[in-house]
């Protein structure tokens, strides 16, 4: 293989000159590497999808996902496969940092600002992190939409609509990453990709044993690391008391884009 590559390089040098031949050789090598990497990501995605289906099927039976051995084993298998996929797709990192580009409605000034979030450690919450990155980053396109449409007393809730995006297969949760103030959780159960920012400590409201469940919790998948002042301003979004759903779409706080920072 090496002899063949060397012969090809020498032939190219004769035709284009050493510098041009080297550049072409490097480009072909990079293209081959990119194709191989894409193939690896696709293979890992298939592995995640298979395991996700298994976990979702178990979840539908109504068993305790934190107490049933079959469920625990299936979840561990899904989490391991998801970590491998995340590292191949988004880069090796303990967690990922993203910038949410916020646009306030005209009723709040119409200006823009940024809220920066850091995901939960991949070691703890790979499935939840994957669901968010898939919807917020991978599936962005012309019909992608995200906006905060609920201002309740304890959360700011946003819809996240991306073609093909799905929610959680189960409520992944780890007590080491609880629903403290300025964390992000998935709305609904299993929940997602719609999410909320906790504006108060919501461990009791959304943690284990909440909302009628003896053991389960909302998934908590990220925290605000910059822009707490922006979040505080968002709490002034016009909304009726009670459930806090914004009646006038013109008063939505729009997330115009989400940018994933390169892993450090």
Q: What role is predicted for each listed range?
A:
Residues 16-264:
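Cyclophilin-like peptidyl-prolyl cis-trans isomerases
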Residues 2-17:
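Cleavable N-terminal signal peptides of Sec/SRP-targeted secreted and luminal proteins
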């Amino acid at each position: 293989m090496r002899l063949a590559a060397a012969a090809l390089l020498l032939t190219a040098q004769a035709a284009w000159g050493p510098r041009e031949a080297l550049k072409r050789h490097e480009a072909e090598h990079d293209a081959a590497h990119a194709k191989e990497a894409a193939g690896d990501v696709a293979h890992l995605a298939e592995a995640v999808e298979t395991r996700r289906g298994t976990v979702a099927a178990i979840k539908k039976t109504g068993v305790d996902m934190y107490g049933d051995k079959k469920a625990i084993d299936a979840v561990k298998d899904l989490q391991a496969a998801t970590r491998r996929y995340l590292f191949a797709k988004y880069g090796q990192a303990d967690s990922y940092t993203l910038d949410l580009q916020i646009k306030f409605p005209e009723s709040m000034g119409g200006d823009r600002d940024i809220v920066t979030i850091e995901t939960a450690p991949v070691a703890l919450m790979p499935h939840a992190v994957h669901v968010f990155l898939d919807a917020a980053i991978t599936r962005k396109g012309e019909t992608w939409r995200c906006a905060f449409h609920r201002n309740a007393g304890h959360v700011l809730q946003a819809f996240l609509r991306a073609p093909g995006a799905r929610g959680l297969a189960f409520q992944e949760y780890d007590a080491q990453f609880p629903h403290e103030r300025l964390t992000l959780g998935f709305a609904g159960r299993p929940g997602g990709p719609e999410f909320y920012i906790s504006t108060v400590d919501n461990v009791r409201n959304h943690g284990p044993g909440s909302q009628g469940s003896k053991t389960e919790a909302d998934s908590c998948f990220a925290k605000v690391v910059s822009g707490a002042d922006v979040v505080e301003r968002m709490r002034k979004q016009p909304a009726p008391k009670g459930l806090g759903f914004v009646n006038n779409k013109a008063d939505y706080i729009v997330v115009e884009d989400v940018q994933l920072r390169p892993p450090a």
